[in-house]
Amino acid sequence: MKKAWLSRARQADAGGASGSEDPPDYGDQGNVQQVGSGPISPEIGPFELSAASEDDPQSGPVEENLDAAAREEQEPHEQEHNGGDDPLDVHTRQPRFVDVNPTQAPVIQLVHAVYDSMLQSDLRPLGSLFLEQNLNIEEFIWMCMTVRHRCQAIRKKPLPIVKQRRWKLLSSCRSWRMGYRTHNLKVNSFESGGDNVHPVLVTATLGCDEGTRHATTYSAGIVQIPRISDQNQKIETAFLMARRARSLSAERYTLFFDLVSSGNTLYAIWIGLGTKNRVSFIEFVGWLCKKDHTHIREWFRQCTGRPKAAKPWLRAHPVAIPYDDPLTNEEIDLAYARGQAMNIEAPRLPDDPIIVEDDDESEEIEAESDEEEDKSGMESLKNIPQTLPYNPTVYGRPAVFDRKSDAKSTKKCRAILTDFSVIKAIEEEHRKKKAARTEQPRATPESQAPTVVLQRPPTQHEPGPAGPLSVQARLEPWQPLPGPQVTTVLLHEESMQGVQVHGSMLDLLEKDDEVMEQRVMATLLPPVPQQPQAGRRGPCVYTGDLGIESDELASTEPVHDQLLPAPGPDPLEIQPLTSPTTSQLSSSAPSCAQTPWPVVQPSQTPDDPMKQSRPPETAAPRQWPMPLRPIPMRPLRMQPIPFNHPVGPTPHQTPQVELTPYKPTWAQMGHIPYQPTPTGPATMLLRQWAPATMQTPPRAPTPMSPPEVPPVPRQRSRGAPTPTPPPQVPPVPRQRPRGAPTPTPPPQVLPTPMQLAPRAPAGQQGPTKQILRQLLTGGVKKGRPSLKLQAALERQAAAGWQPSTGSGTSAKIVRAPVFYPPVLQPIQVMGQGGSPTAMAASTVTQEPTEYTRERRGVGPMPPTDIPPSKRAKIEAYTEPEMPHGGASHSPVVILENVGQGQQQTLECGGTAKQERDVLGLGDIAVSSPSSSETSNDE
């Protein structure tokens, strides 16, 4: 190193003349091979001059590998660096540098080291890398030496060492005696989201003179990252988070970040603000005062010296400073609340635009300024390589990693995004599905209420008093109903095993064929234009002796449908509104008739809108499975409680009853038979699970008391209403709601499975507990197998038990629309006073209640002597009734449509008392089916 300085000094003294005296062997080559020629030790120092090396021309090695072109390129650089006012003159005047730490060396020595590194052609383009960056002394020396050593290792292959995984410690070049050394240092890294630190291992590859002879080099012992203390770690993290928040914040808040960073207090900023910036500053203060701002509070404390941010507008404004157009308290509170609601990352309102700096203009400006500069500088910058080519030979690498590039298998697990054929196929399939949905009108109104499934019995073609129903019928156009006053009724037809029914929605659901499902629904319910209708009565509206007043208008086209057995003197009837395929199913009081469940076929109206609901005679007869589950053994809980006062027939209802015999026993059907009387104007309930091949069983005497003898009252649960025998009173017309048009006779329809999903109509009160008991005919316990239940049903059927006779009164009318969505969901059953109760079906065979076990062996009771359920009474609680005209709910029946071979029953359960008190549910709480039961049903 000393010889290089002396040679340059002599060249400078000679004024750059061509005849200047230089060292004979190496003076013209500059200092390329002289770096590190003398041993450097930590005791002496790296820049100590030796007199012996100054006189001995052989003390420095001679560079043998540089060609003539390299020498020609290096000469002008030497002339440039050493000519004129070269700082080397000042440096060479100092005779010795003894015990000089590299950290304390003058900057001129560092510049000289950079020049020495740049003399090689491989390192020359890196001049800008060192001279254009703001580097401190340690970073400067580190970069100089590491880049020089790396480039030298690239140009010349190092001496191979077995299993050497790092840079080589020795070099084979005679003129490059500097080796390499790696230093490891564990430091802590900053984390932007908190105070936690993560240890990081930093490895620095350093160069050393004479291979591994010396432990220290130009960079050894200089680049040391100090460990940061916990307090400094907290401060640095706080300032880092503040800078990040400023970069992400809206533009109007960046001024306040700068003012706070400058040490200004919030009060000083407040009194110096203008009118237009006050609201923004209040929002900024609100953001500063967020409780979870740990780092921002630390940043604020470090900048201002205050422990936390305060509201500066609460202090008195100085008199000397004018305060024009002051803000009101409301404006201040709103602005502060907006600041409190901002995101913790940065003060930004939701409607603030995100400003992205456009680099195109800045690049154009820089390009124009660069064009005005020296062209040579631009060329040198263009020649700087982006990455240095370095492919060192790694020894000891396992052979398993030596794989050819062509042998690598491509990923075949995911589709290629550039293959548009797959995308087009998916889009075409989606387009077909969308077209199928648009062709079929939406049959399900947007209803939040769950649905109920009722299975319909087969069609009976025997003539009745009104004559047989016409086989050919035409479809009634479906009329969409208003949202809050509709009850959804879904028709769902199942097919027997072995019978291929094209329209079986259950099969389509199992196959998950949405296109075929839409086609079948389109055939069942063709799109028709809507017809204007008068105001309709809300769905599932129970009127009459229930004490319910309905302020809805009656429907102009009532249609009969089915329901569970009605109480003795006051039967019920469901009439869906203008359904395309519905059945007229009525209920009446049980009696000692010989045939159970006669088919209801009312009088044929001349203009029947439901004629097309029946299939043609040529079509194959539909076979209906037995989907319903069995109900409890004894008929005590099955018997509905009669109402306290009778109600006359509805003026618009003139049904006629026809008895249809059934062949199999009721034990095989999984249900206890009810045998209504065929006399009187009341219509009978048609059970929906009766197959088409049923015949009438032989008439057998019933063990029950004759209908003319009133039954003896028995012990009942506490609070149960006293049932009365069915009185024989003349029919009295029932009152209709005010303003309702005179309803017309119900049209003739066919039995069809349907689903009920009620929505609570406004202005109605809920039904009484008798209606709920009629709906919940199977409130028994779970867990018992169905064998006992079937045996009990067979014994009852063998005994020929029949219920007592009820007075023939008109049926109650319940209206509901009809549509086709194949959905099975639990619903809510409304108790007395409009209280909702959840109700669902279960596949678990249930056991009779405690009351039923007490009465076991006594024999069936007449329907008028059935006390209410103890379970229902214990779990019941009263809810205040809604006044007239208030919002209420309608009762609803739920049955689930299950697969073939399964049985159905109705279960009644209740939630715990504390749950009812908390939830505030209705009169009687009924348990809903569990997830396993629901999935089993589906």
From Swiss-Prot:
* Alphabetic keyword roster: Host nucleus, Host-virus interaction, Transcription, Transcription regulation
Name the source's superkingdom. Answer: Viruses
Residue stretches of biased makeup (Pro residues): 698-713, 722-750
Looking at the UniProt record for this protein, which Gene Ontology cellular component terms does it annotate, in alphabetical order?
host cell nucleus
Q: Name the residue ranges with Polar residues bias.
A: 840-849
What InterPro entries does its record include?
EBNA-3/4/6
The reply to whether Transcription regulation figures as a keyword in the UniProt entry is yes
Q: Where in the cell is it found?
A: Host nucleus
Task: Locate the compositionally biased regions of type Low complexity.
Answer: 575-594, 927-938
Query: What biological-process GO terms show up in the record?
Result: viral process
> Which residues fall in a compositionally biased region of kind Acidic residues?
360-374
Positions with biased composition (Basic and acidic residues):
69-92, 431-440
Which residues does the annotated region (Disordered) include? 1-92, 360-389, 431-471, 560-626, 694-767, 834-870, 919-938
Q: Give the protein's biological function.
A: May be involved in transcriptional regulation of both viral and cellular genes by interacting with the host DNA-binding protein RBPJ.
According to the record's subunit comment, the protein's assembly and interactions are:
Interacts (via N-terminus) with host RBPJ.
Entry similarity comment: Belongs to the herpesviridae EBNA-4 family.
Q: What's the protein here called? A: Epstein-Barr nuclear antigen 4
